[in-house]
């Protein structure tokens, strides 16, 4: 079930990490702003990669994020669906729901805020969404980033900082001192063990499991 998706009010800051947290990931003392420009850019990349790994839908204009945003979806209904699978999860506010041009009240729907599932109801009965456009406006994402999500983002930031400081193709290095100084480096040939084709390594991806969206046809 596809929808037309629009970000109405984007997050003021889509980054999952504060500059203080990024400084800590880089091993800087509190208040050391010497690398803030570099770390701010790193934080943006890390947050974007996590959003990609979690399959967070964007509107083609704003950067997808797990931070809180006001969004709008329009579903073209065929009269056979009882559930709307919203593009964003962790919903904090359901602002507006209309079906075929008629506004619904709170008692007309049942929302699973964490899963992003919206059901049409009447009392204790589940109804099918009628033919026509179903419009949903809501706020989803986090104002305050959960600790486990911060931890995963910090791990990815540290990994990126570590990778930037060394050559990932170097398998091993040995130094001989006797006469002058001989440095020998062995390089990996082919794929580097532990590497990943995606933006987020498997161990960090496992920590993000509850934030990953499931694709719905």
Model-derived segments and their meaning:
Residues 1-217:
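Divalent metal-cofactor coordination and adjacent catalytic microenvironments
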